[in-house]
């Protein structure tokens, strides 16, 4: 069965479409949604069977953790533990936006989400679709890229359908995303940090936000 493709306005998403998408997520499905960078595979990260389905759909090694999309700092404080001051400085400077911050995880999610590392990758995208869908569902979402592992990232619903149209039930189509560059990844350990990946936010902007905090090799 091929995926259903539903058009959605990126700036003003129809609540009925999001309610329909949330229904799929509540049933443990994996769906594709546009973010402020690329399309992502969204699922309920608390539902272990949904998490396992993501790894199956992508062909993703279970040794790789799943990023989590949030729409408030409240979720960050629930899903992470002992957040350092530099986390909040980065969040204030770059969120909502294309920054993923890796911190110590709490015990609120299945270990498979963190690949048994007890570290969690959090992102608050600048996306009304993602933010409103999280609010509709009542929990954060997984946010791994909507592609087959090792294949090109997808910046449009057409590209997602080409790769995953026979593996997922629903794709929300907001057209081409604004930025085909993935998010920047910063890892925090206490007051030390390292750049895991330079993406849509340049390294200089991260350094400016963190001031005099010491960077360590990745």
Model-derived segments and spans:
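Active-site-adjacent structural elements in enzyme catalytic cores
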Residues: 1-218
């Amino acid at each position: 069965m091929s995926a259903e493709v539903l058009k959605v306005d990126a700036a003003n998403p129809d609540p009925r479409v999001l309610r329909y998408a949330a229904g799929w997520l509540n049933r443990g499905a994996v769906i594709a949604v546009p973010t402020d960078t690329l399309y992502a595979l969204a699922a309920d990260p608390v539902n272990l069977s949904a998490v396992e389905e993501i790894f199956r759909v992508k062909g993703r090694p279970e040794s790789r953790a799943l990023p989590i999309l949030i729409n408030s700092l409240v979720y960050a404080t629930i899903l992470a533990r002992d957040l350092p001051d530099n986390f909040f400085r980065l969040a204030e400077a770059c969120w909502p936006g294309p920054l993923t911050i890796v911190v110590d995880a709490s015990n609120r999610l299945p270990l498979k989400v963190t690949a048994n590392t007890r570290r969690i990758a959090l992102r608050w995208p600048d996306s009304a679709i993602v933010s409103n869908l999280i609010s509709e569902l009542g929990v954060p979402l997984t946010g791994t890229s909507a592609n087959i592992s090792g294949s090109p990232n997808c910046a449009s619903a057409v590209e997602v359908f080409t790769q995953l149209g026979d593996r997922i039930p629903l794709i929300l189509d907001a057209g081409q995303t604004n930025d085909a560059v993935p998010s920047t990844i910063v890892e925090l350990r206490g007051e030390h940090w390292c750049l895991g990946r330079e993406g849509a936010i340049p390294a200089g902007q991260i350094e400016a936000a963190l001031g005099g905090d010491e960077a360590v090799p990745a």
